[in-house]
Amino acid sequence: MKKQIAVLVSALLLGGGAYAQNSVQAQKPKAYMVSDAHLDTQWNWDIQTTIKDYVWNTISQNLFLLKQYPEYIFNFEGGVKYAWMKEFYPREYELMKEYIKEGRWHISGSSWDANDALVPSTESFIRNIMLGQEYYRKEFGVESTDIFLPDCFGFGWTLPTIAAHCSLIGFSSQKLDWRVHPFFGKSKHPFTIGVWKGIDGSSIMLAHGYDYGKRWNDVDLSENKELMELAERTPLKTVYRYYGTGDIGGSPTVGSVRSVEKGVKGNGPLQIISATSDQLFKDYQPYKEHPELPVYDGELLMDVHGTGCYTSQAAMKLYNRQNELLGDAAERAAVGAEWLNLADYPGTFLSDAWKRFIYHQFHDDLTGTSIPRAYEFSWNDELISLSQFSDVLTSSVRGVASQLDTRVKGIPVVLYNPLGFSAKSVVEVEVSMPRAPKGVSVFDEAGKKVASQLLSYQNGKANLLIDAVVPPVGYAVYDVRTSGEKATELSAPVREGENYRVENSVYSMKLDANGDIISLLDKKNDKEIVKPGKAIRLALFTENKSYSWPAWEILKETIDKEPISITDKNTEITLVENGPLRKTIRIKKQHDESVFCQYI
């Protein structure tokens, strides 16, 4: 009996020793080492170079490292890049899938591609995540749980809300630390690790990953002073640290991988964790049980870098927004056509169109920061998607229209409203007519005359405006009749010395001889909007002192200066539309060899 008691006591002592040892380990500062090979889909190269060189380098180099180093975990984002691996490098793709099963090749970022976080609509941001997760489930049987954007030009307050509603738990980046020459200052990160609250109160965890190109040369990271200092800066005694390579893909260096492996096995004062991009976030779930986590409630915008991304390559912004709107309208119309048994819902076709343009929301593509040749591929894809959405929208609306009662006295015009609420708007339509009408009259479905305006007639086509009301996600039929009476034209702009004045029931506007708006009076509130001497004009800035990226780096000191007024040659001010629904003034200016036409 005494022997049994002695054995029991020994076991308890051994267990206590193990517990004490684990407690010491748990109390060590931690470093979550997150490998990455961030790959710009396009930037200083085009998509062909990405697929031929950088995608290949990424998959081949990391397969080598995964085979050689058992502690190595690789993180990589962008569903479209995985799709290219499957298409162009199928053998390596199958090998990679085995490491994904083992949890050593980690799917990061959740999305179809690492998108810009400011320009895309909320719908396409969510769609980007949905398309990425759909691919990951189908191909690998997994889902990602984080937003992984190491290199992106700022993050809106909507990001944590969008992420949380997509069941994601964390977000990481390093871009807000961009403070190199000539941009000196403090980091824009509110903290290195904490909770970010979105506009509706939804929250995700936020981690600052520092420089993603960090490397080491075969050292024991458990004794690394830099990592220890970073961990000790926070009350959490924890650092989340990217390492690897940036922009061109590839992999971390062998020396860096060996350093992490030595650190994992090391006995230094720092606990090294070879981590997936979301492991830190999972370790702190649920966040409510960790009051030590600081909370940030606001937006995280870049203020010194990439500050011209809203204006650079404006055509990309236009095509992207057209695709966002047309894609949504086409889907709603197609649902209606299917519900009426007029056509099968073209889900695969529509998904293909979304994928084709949405990967161009990548942070160096939609932002306008890539080389000109890259946009030849981008525009091509945007236009193909527009054509696909247009085909679905047109065929679906025609199908539904064929079921409507269009028996009217004149020419029937069917209007479709894809919005989720009733729309009252001035709509521009094109109507076939055998001869030019002097005027038109338009009637709604109740036979009530509505306001209209004939704009032009050419080659058997009349363009006109209709003051229309269309129900939500619905249709309305209008009756267009020609009339022998020409519509009464309204008064032209009133000349007041060298200035012009034009007004409606809401505003009274004055233009000077250069076409600049010198007065804009809100008649309902009796408030002048333009400050004296501060005319609203077409601005010209000629001294943008961006050091490296003048197309997409507009410095604050440039904007703060008074812009140059374009007054090189005589300005032409012409009334080009004059009717009850729309009055339009064209202002034509010239500066050097450029001609500018503005319409008000």
Predicted regions and their residues:
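Positively charged n-region of N-terminal signal peptides that target proteins for export
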Residues: M1-Q4
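Bacterial N-terminal signal peptides
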Residues: V7-G15
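Active-site and substrate-binding clefts of carbohydrate-active enzymes
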Residues: Y32-D40, P190-R407, Y416-P418, L465-D467
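Surface-exposed loop and adjacent secondary-structure segments within mature catalytic domains
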Residues: L95-G103, E123, G156-R215
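Alpha-helical scaffold elements lining the catalytic groove of polysaccharide deacetylases
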Residues: A117-Y135, Y210-A231, E553, T558-E562
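CE4/NodB-like, metal-dependent polysaccharide N-deacetylase domain
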Residues: F125-F153, W157, H165, K225-Y243
